[in-house]
Regions:
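Conserved beta-loop-alpha segment that forms the PLP phosphate-binding cup at the N-terminus of a helix
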Residues: 1-39, 50
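Conserved PLP-binding catalytic core of the aspartate aminotransferase-like
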Residues: 227-278
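Active-site phosphate-binding strand-loop segment of PLP-dependent enzymes
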Residues: 68, 72-126
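Structural signature of PLP-dependent enzymes
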Residues: 190-238
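A short helix->loop->beta-strand "cap" motif at the edges of active sites that frequently abuts
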Residues: 40, 64, 110-116, 138-139
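Active-site PLP attachment segment
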Residues: 135-185
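Substrate-binding/gating loop at the entrance of the active-site cleft, primarily
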Residues: 22-25, 30, 44-63, 73-75
Length: 312
């Protein structure tokens, strides 16, 4: 059931390409393990999440990888001009809210023999409308239920395109669950997304994900409708101009918008702490304050936040 919900959300042609794991780091390690050459030539944006940055830094340190990091604006051109084995990019950058719109350009470069393209959809899944139907046969997509899917921890997933990475070196016994009758010594793999499965894990997150999706379906709430509602709250907050000393990194344009507003300023950490003392929950990444609005808030909540900010 969870596979079907995810496939419908992303417009994937086949739910069986989806595998589950407690975290996306597992999938990064398994994908990397399936690349036969060393060092692996990796291209990524300079705004990737901590788990990717830490693991990649360690692989570079160990001589396992050569990393090229560029800004999101330079990613597509660099990918087209260079020779890489792995291209990794967030759909929505966690620290700035910028949205990468060149997914089709990156996908056009992907081949089973390399390069492979991995899209980190953690801030995109159920946060912005995402249609992978045209590129599903070429790209990996990783995400999870911890953010906008409202399913909590421990329910992450990977869409693995057919014919790419058929035999990850890092593997668990679930990856051969359909082939347990193989003779001793044979290492079999599922032919679908199950080839990226690990071993025994707590499946309760899948039940939470299913429950959330059923509830949203019953209420007629799609990602598009929720995003439109949140965008009204975001614009209401922006119009109030209650953070004049901060720069908004992700102003509204003509396309999709992240579910959070990213404000950059030297006092971001101090303001985060000050708001927390007033029971206003935001988060901070270095000098960037992220303010997220959701379905459970309304214009009155925005006005209260504006009042608190103006009174500081």
């Amino acid at each position: 059931e969870a596979q079907r919900h995810i496939a419908r959300e992303l417009n994937l042609p086949d739910p069986s390409t989806i595998a589950f794991s407690p975290n996306t780091h597992d999938f990064l390690v398994r994908i990397f393990s399936a690349i036969p050459k060393r060092p692996v030539r990796v291209l990524a944006t300079d705004g990737e999440f901590h788990s990717f940055r830490r693991q990649m830094a360690r692989w570079v340190e160990a001589g396992e990888a050569i990393l090229t990091s560029v800004s999101a604006d330079e990613l597509a051109a660099t990918a087209q001009a260079g020779e890489f084995d792995l291209i990794f990019a967030s759909h929505v950058l966690f620290n700035s809210g910028a949205i990468i719109t060149d997914l089709e350009v990156l996908a056009a470069l992907a081949k089973p023999e390399g390069p492979w393209v991995v899209i980190d959809g953690y801030h995109g899944f159920m946060g912005v409308e995402t249609d992978l139907s045209a590129i599903a046969h070429r790209v990996f997509y990783v995400s999870g239920g911890y953010k906008y899917a409202m399913a909590g921890e421990g329910v992450c997933f990977l869409h693995a395109p057919p014919e790419f990475a058929p035999r990850p070196v890092i593997t668990g016994w679930y990856a051969a669950f359909e082939d347990l009758a193989l003779p001793p010594g044979a290492v079999g793999y599922a032919q679908d997304g199950g080839r990226f499965l690990g071993s025994t894990f707590d499946p309760s997150g899948l039940y939470r994900l299913n429950a959330v999706r059923r509830m949203l379906d019953a209420e007629g709430l799609t990602t598009a409708k929720i995003s439109a509602y949140v965008a009204k709250l975001q614009k209401h907050f922006i119009d109030a101009n209650s953070l004049p000393d901060f720069d908004l990194l992700n102003p509204f344009g003509t396309g999709n918008h992240a579910r959070f507003l990213a404000y950059k300023g030297p006092d971001a950490a101090a303001l985060h702490a000050q708001l927390e003392s007033r029971n206003v929950i935001t988060d901070v990444r270095s000098d960037v304050l992220r303010i997220g609005f959701g379905l459970y808030q309304d214009a009155e909540d925005v006005d209260r936040l504006v009042e608190i900010l103006r009174a500081r």
